[in-house]
């Protein structure tokens, strides 16, 4: 069977945690492989630090974006779909696009799939996927999601999504970021105020206040941020900060890539990119 000249390049930040890689990035890639058997699938990671760690520690070599583009040239690929597993179209995604487009003269076409959160429909799908996954939590428990955050203006999406959880019927779900806003301190204050406002609506409903938080990463992979900044046992971790504020804290180390509905969104974004070529 002749090799296809069409390829899908799946670009991820990467992770040094093997279990997290298998549970998220590889499952996304495998779902794309299954959905588009007529395409050859390539992988690239963008974190130089993680690539270096894997090479030195595990003797695992994963190409960066430029290396993957050069490999596709060598393999005779002419049509490229690039699907990032980034959450937002922020700085990391823009750098990736620039690197890819520096090779545009070597291919007949290059089309980009959108990051995970790229519109209202995506946002609503994500809200329901997470809301349904954690619907077992009782009324005294809040789900606190840790996003990465970015200095890019696109960071406003985190606050918008936090509000969308409430608007779509998930008042106990809160979204913050580790490197931008909303910060963990802002979330602690918001959750504290939630208990006060809930009680003020009904003076007999003292049981509406939040007593416990379940922490989970709003990141594709449950990597270093999730293990250390979120669930770590040091005083500045989110788990410790919530415990110091008087809440019981439980951490779930499961990245968004482990959720089927999230992976389905990436497959949908690949299909949209393919459709854009034919239009």
Residue ranges, per PLM feature:
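Active-site-proximal alpha-helix that buttresses catalytic centers in soluble enzyme cores
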Residues: 1-279
